[in-house]
Structure formats: structure tokens, C-alpha cells
Amino acid sequence: MDRNTFTGLFLIMVILAGSVFFMKPSEEEIKKEQQLQDSIAQRKTPDQKKSTDSLFAAQQGLEASTIDSTQMTGPFGGAKVGAEELVVLENEFIKASISTKGGRVKSVEVKGEKDYKGNPLVLFNGNKNKFGLQFSTAGVNINTNDLYFLPQSKESINVSKTDSASLTLRLNYAENKYIDYIYSLKGESYQLGFTVITKGMQDVVAPAESKLVLNWQAELPQKEKDMKDERNRSTAYFRLSDGDVDELSTTSDDSKELGKTDWISFKQHYFSNVLIAKNGFSNGSLKVTTLSSDEIVKSFAANMDLSFNRQDVNSYPMAFYFGPNKYSILKDQGLDLEKQINMGWGPMKWINRFITLPVFNLLEGFNWNYGLIILVLTILLKIVLSPLTYKSYVSMAKMRVLKPEMDEIKAKVGEDNQTLLQQEYLKLYKQAGVNPMGGCIPMVLQMPFMIAFFFFFPNLFELRGESFLWMKDLSTYDSIINFPMIPIININHISLMCILMTCATLISTWYNNMVSGATGQMKYIGYFMPLIFFFVLNSYPAGLNYYYFLSTCFTFVIQFFIRQSINDEKIHGMIQANKKKPETGKKKSSFQKRMEDYMRQQQKTNKK
């Protein structure tokens, strides 16, 4: 360095040092400036100070911290690092823990409910649940699930019955450019309001993109005792904008592309996680996968599109439903959420929705034990169906009285010529005025009610955790013996109520065979069916087997008293009197007409 350069640098340093010294404000000027700043600070409202401190200063403080600056480069660089914190938003129904990482709901506890181990019931928890907006900017793919949001408040919020509260988390991009997640909760609700607001993002989101993709993934843990049954009743549901509610497969891995959609649901047996879009999702996709895990029931994934408009502010109002699959509660939410509950198909669905469920809810109002409610429900059903039972039994009595004459016809005609044998039987039925299907039709009319309960009780949330007698939980099986899984038949326990139901059915079958005089294959089929039902129903809820046990017992008692009131000799006399009536005065039943037409067709075929 030459002398001139050294002299120039020295003079510059002297000038800078002198300017700092001579331009320093006096103590009086410093005091006046401090008073002015204090006055301005006092005029700021607490909300303005909180907003400024929590949503902007915190971000600036983060950037000034000792975090490695190389991690904070690129779009949303200041939000790529941070420490995860949880803010709790709860009421008397649910407790939602909201994470600053991703601004997502990290876990939800349904208050007042327990899992099969007796622990507080948590719908989902931990990092196995992901939730975020996906888009690209400046050639970089962004997923807000991986970024850190700034909470409006870090204090937990407990909402009382009549109150409501909200929590805002902000993801800053730059000044006046951010994404807000706003959660809101009312005092008595299973719904957690959720609104996404984008501010100044029209120049941030890549010009080629017209949507934000909302990605939601969850691995839902086991909550019920029977993992296999819970898996078979867990899947994803959705409602399209045309009002059609549909589901993915419950028994295998499945996926589906969706059009405009109102809501999606990650449904387990007795609880659902629903995301409702007030303005609908423009498109989307759902996927359900069964993992090889002893703790996770199923893995759910959804990618739902939110239309993005090139404007300063976009708002996407939504809501979560985190709660039980109880028909009345789901129906109160609107949007057909109750259609997630499998009430059966065809007439069984209508029986359960408009007869069984209203009567059950009426009995529930008496605050009886649920075992007693099922008992009363069974009695009421038997009273309503008793006319059909009586008619069926009278028809069976007529066939029993005719059996000796039918045996004579069989001996006379022989069993080789079945066509002629059936013709002779029809002639006898016509003369006696007996409809051979008269005993079957009333029983067939009762079958929809029997099948309806097969769907009703296994999906009835009200039975969950309710005990009766030795049954600790009416919503699952009551095992008295447990053992390793037996291949082929796939059972690892014995249900006491299922045994009682099977025994009652076998006794009823024996009595009916004795009364009706059943012989041959029909006699043994009657004993075979209850054994099949045992293996089918052994893992079904104790409440269902309890109902079938009561139903079989009451049917047996009713049949016994009807049998005592029916006089076979009187019926025989009526049949003989009917035989003496002229043929023209006897009206043929539709069954007899069809059988006669069938016989004539058979005769024509045989002649050819």
C-alpha cells in the first residue's frame, strides 16, 4: 500500500469517528424521544400489540436467532426451521391439540369415551397424521405440513357451554403475504371450524397453477377389542355435490378419483374424522390401505383440490367433525353424515331408520339398562308380528292334519312319477282349501325384521361400553374361553351368549320338527343351520346374540301357547267339510294357479 492510499484511508476513518461523536444526541434529546415512544406504545390496543408481537416479531426473532442460515433459504425460508409447540383447543366434547409445525391438528381426544384398553379415546395422534396445502412457487414444491406457523396465542383455550373461541396460526412469506389457518370451536359441539385464508399469494403461487391441493393422511389406531371386525367396518366415505354418499371398499385396499365433493370422512367402526368444505372441493382422490400392523386399523389418504383465484385474498371455509358415529348426532350435523352408518339395504334399511331406531330411542328415554331396552324392544316386535306367527302356525297345523292323506297318495302313486304326485297333492290342497305356502309366507314377511337387526345392533353406538349381566360390553363379543386362532374356521374364543342363542335355536328346531312331523333331509337341515349361525355370530356383538336368544325364546313360548289353543280334530273337521263343497265354489290361490300351469307345461314336455 503506497503512502497516498494509507493517508486517504486514515482520513476517512477519522471523519467517520468524528461524525459519530459530534452527531450523538444530547441526554435531553434522548429523554424527549423516549417519552414520545412511550406515548405511542400506550395508544396501541392490546390486540394490535399481540398481533404484531406474535405474528411478525416472532418471525423476525427467529431469523435473527442462531439457527443455521443455510436452512432458511428459498421460499418460506424463515418458516422451515423452528421448535414444535402445541396449543390445545377444547370443550366438553373434544380436545384438539394443534401443532405449530404444519399448523395442523396433531391429535384429537373424544372426551368421556375410552378405548378397549380403558385409556382415553384418541382418534389419531403423532406424526403419522399429516395435513397441509401443496403448491409450487419459484420452481419449488411447497407443503405447509413441513413448515412452522406462528400461533396468535400459545395459551390453551377451554370453551364453556355457551361460548366460542378461535385460534389463528400464520405462515408468513413476506410482508402482507401469508397463509392463515383459523380454528374455531363452540362449547357444545363435535365440530372444529377450520378456515384457510391466503393473503397476497397471487404472485407467489406459480402462474400455471389454478388450485391448492389439500393433502390429509392419517393412520388410525385400534379402538375396539376385535381388530378384524373394526377393519371390516372402517373405510373412507364421501358425498358428491349431487348428494350421492358413497364409500370405498371395507374388505380390501381401494382408491377412487372424485369430482366435486362436499365432504370426505375417514371412518372407523364407532368414530369418524370428517372434513367438510362449505363451498365444496373441486376435485380429489381418496385411498384406503390396510397395514401389516397390530396397532393401526387402516391408513387413509386424501388429496382434495381447492380452486385458487388470482386475487389478493382467498377464503376457504371448512369444518372438521371429530366424534362418534351416533345416528342422531351425525344427523344433526347435516349433509347426510348419518349415511355412513350401515343400516342395511332395501327394506331392512327403512325398517331400521323409521321403525327400529325411533322405538329404541323412545325406550332409551326411560334411562333403563340397555339389556332391558333390548328385552322390551324384542317383546314389542313379537307382539306386532304375532298375527303373522299365528297364521303361519295354523297353516302348519293344516298341513300336519293332511299328512296322513298325503302319505296315502305317495304310496298309491309312487315317488317315481313326481309330476303325477304333485298333481295329486294339488288336487288334495284344492279340495281341502289349504295353501301349502300359507306357513311360509308369514315367515318370509318376518324375515326383513330379523335381518334388519343383523345390521342394527353391530352399528349401534349406544351399546358401546354398556354392560348387562356378565356381558361387559354389548357392542362386542362376550368371550368366556380364549385360545389361539384355529385355521379354516378362524375363531379364537367362545362367546357365551352365542352358545345360549345356538342352544335355544336347537331346542326350538327340535320342538318344531316334533310338531310338524318333519322327516328326511328337512329334519336334519333344521339342526344344521343353528350350528352354522354359531360360527358366523360367535364374533358378533353380544347385544345381537342376546336379541336373537330372546327372539327365539319368545317365539318358542308363543308357538307353544298357539299349539295348545289349536285343536287338530277341529281343523280336520273343517278340512273335511271343505272337501264336500262344490269345486266351482272354491277359489284357487295364486300358488295353486301357478302350480297347475306348471304341471300342464310339464305334461306337454313329457308328451313330446
Q: What label would you give each PLM region?
A:
Residues 81-339:
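Soluble non-transmembrane domains of integral membrane proteins
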Residues 48-84:
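Short, Gly/Pro- and small/polar-rich lid/capping loops
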Residues 42, 58-59, 65, 110, ...:
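Intrinsic disorder/low-complexity segments
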Residues 18, 57, 64, 149-152:
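Generic detector of low-complexity/intrinsically disordered segments
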Residues 69, 78-80, 90, 249, ...:
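General structural signal for secondary-structure boundaries
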Residues 1-56, 98, 187, 194-202, ...:
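Helix-loop-helix
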